[in-house]
């Protein structure tokens, strides 16, 4: 069964391709390689014996999308492609709305023309905004994200619900991620951000391997046990398995189904630093910096719905997330080859 994976050479997309292949699916990748490298395909082949076909292009290219649907019997689409840095989105809102919202519109139109009406969308816990209760449950109201990135994800969620309401033949699953970290346990695949990392774990990894001098921890006066921000960190392979679970339940379930994918427990920035220091066997340099606008003190997921309806649960601990990230970064100090 062929699955089109937009953004499939990126961090989460590539790990999901591995898990899809192991589950018997045949991913076809569309990626403009703006934050990834095509050399990941060789790593996917090393792990699975299968090399997905890569179309190096943009989801806003309707002609390219039509050619992909014409060339392959695509059964479903997993839609990862999009810009994803919260802070960057504040300074570049037009690019975020163009990529994330307009790009999804072009994809949906191409899917409709090809009569492919099975979609899994990569959303984010940022759609919840600041909630008065923790953990976050899917039934919580949305509508107050604090960044253009979060608003772009929420806009797409609303578009998907409108599309499905107009045409009930669509099967749509929205997966709201919390904080994906970690790497494939083989050390062959991991997160390789272009430029300065926007996320905590890859920045720590680059400090540990000597590419960065010190980690900036944004804020140490939050109302949390150690004063640093608390987040729900989920191992990327657990997250990838969540997509496979969603694929297995997608067909024949018309509607829009929303699931949190998180570990269901929060860890502070300093706890993550301690876990990584343990993994790499040395202390890591860090310093405190002012809070970033829009950052919340603490949140984590209630993933009960995914457990009950998808049969999915996380199985990897924070220590494993840190150890697997270090295994990847120490084997690949400069990331993937160009």
Curated annotation (Swiss-Prot):
Pathway: Carbohydrate metabolism; galactose metabolism. InterPro entries: NAD(P)-bd_dom, NAD(P)-bd_dom_sf, UDP_G4E. Substrate binds at residues 124, 149, 179, 199-200, 216-218, 231, 292-295, 299. Keywords: Carbohydrate metabolism, Galactose metabolism, Isomerase, NAD. It comes from the Bacteria. Gene3D superfamilies: NAD(P)-binding Rossmann-like Domain, UDP-galactose 4-epimerase, domain 1. NAD(+) binds at residues 11-12, 31-36, 58-59, 80-84, 99, 124, 149, 153, 178. Its EC number is 5.1.3.2. Pfam families: GDP_Man_Dehyd. Its cofactor is NAD(+). One of its GO terms (molecular function) is UDP-glucose 4-epimerase activity. It catalyses: UDP-alpha-D-glucose = UDP-alpha-D-galactose. One of its GO terms (biological process) is monosaccharide metabolic process. GO terms for cellular component: cytosol. The active site is at residue 149. Involved in the metabolism of galactose. Catalyzes the conversion of UDP-galactose (UDP-Gal) to UDP-glucose (UDP-Glc) through a mechanism involving the transient reduction of NAD. PANTHER family: UDP-GLUCOSE 4-EPIMERASE. Belongs to the NAD(P)-dependent epimerase/dehydratase family. Homodimer. This is UDP-glucose 4-epimerase. The lineage of its organism: Bacteria, Pseudomonadati, Pseudomonadota, Gammaproteobacteria, Enterobacterales. The gene is galE.
């Amino acid at each position: 069964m062929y699955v089109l994976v937009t953004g499939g050479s990126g961090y989460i997309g590539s790990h999901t391709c591995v898990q899809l292949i192991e589950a018997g699916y045949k991913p076809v990748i569309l990626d403009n390689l703006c934050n990834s490298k095509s050399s990941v395909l060789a790593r996917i082949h090393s792990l699975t014996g299968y090399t997905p076909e890569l179309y190096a292009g943009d989801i806003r290219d309707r002609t390219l999308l039509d050619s992909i649907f014409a060339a392959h019997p695509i059964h479903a689409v997993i839609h990862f492609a999009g810009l994803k840095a919260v802070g960057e989105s504040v300074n570049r809102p037009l690019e975020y709305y163009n990529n994330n919202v307009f790009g999804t519109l072009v994809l949906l139109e191409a899917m409709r023309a090809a009569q492919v009406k099975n979609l899994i969308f990569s959303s984010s816990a940022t759609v919840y905004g600041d909630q008065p209760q923790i953990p976050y449950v899917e039934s919580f109201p949305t509508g107050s994200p604090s960044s253009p990135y979060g608003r772009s994800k929420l806009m797409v969620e609303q578009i998907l619900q409108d599309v499905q309401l107009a045409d009930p033949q669509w099967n749509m699953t929205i997966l709201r991620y919390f904080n994906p970290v970690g790497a494939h346990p083989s050390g062959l695949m991991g997160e390789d951000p272009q430029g300065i990392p926007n996320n905590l774990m890859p920045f720590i990894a680059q400090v540990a391997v000597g590419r960065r001098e010190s980690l900036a921890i944004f804020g140490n006066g939050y109302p949390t046990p150690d004063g640093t921000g608390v987040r729900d960190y989920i191992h990327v392979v657990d997250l990838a398995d969540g997509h496979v679970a969603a694929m297995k339940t997608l067909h024949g379930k018309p509607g829009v189904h929303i699931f949190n994918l998180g570990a269901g427990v929060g860890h502070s920035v300093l706890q993550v630093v301690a876990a990584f220091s343990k993994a790499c066997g040395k202390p890591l340099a860090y310093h405190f910096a002012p809070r970033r606008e829009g950052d919340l003190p603490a949140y984590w997921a209630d993933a009960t719905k995914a457990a009950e309806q998808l049969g999915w649960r996380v199985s990897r601990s924070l220590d494993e997330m840190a150890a697997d990230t270090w295994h990847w970064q120490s084997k690949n100090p400069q990331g993937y080859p160009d």
